[in-house]
């Protein structure tokens, strides 16, 4: 083994030792593997190229290239990124993480937490609070209801979402859909108490009947609707 090879092997061993040691202090060991690894001891940054795998606790992230900083606990992966955990999965083109719990994902993002899903061009998500902000082609699916908009903020732990811009919602089980400038959707997990508040040019269709108003409050449990904010119009379609 020549001098350059010995240095390369020592560098990789040093990288893995530093990574594990830094995380062992927090009882959360971390492992990085890749086709090529390099490490800057001054900055604490490890650069990885080719089949990158970062594993910590129950989460495994993979990508084509990436880096991790052992001092700042920051990481970034690019190129067909995926993250899989016990009850979470995410795919995107690029993922940047801070403190191992705050993620910014861009490029055809799909995140699933248990049975709840969010899609969009860009997603900011915190795994501790389960708060996510989706920008661009935003879509949230929870408890049978799909909510879309230019932007959607979601609190997945409590099932609460606020959508802005060209908003739509659908619930095929309840045979109801609607649209508006903005919407707020709330529901208690595993309870039949879902409610959608549409604001601004609110429009809803329930079992073929059409309702238009400045604001609409729709209760999914009994398919009831309440108009708010001004003059409203109801179009009733006779049973065929």
List each model region and its residues.
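Mature-chain termini and adjacent capping regions
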Residues: 1-240
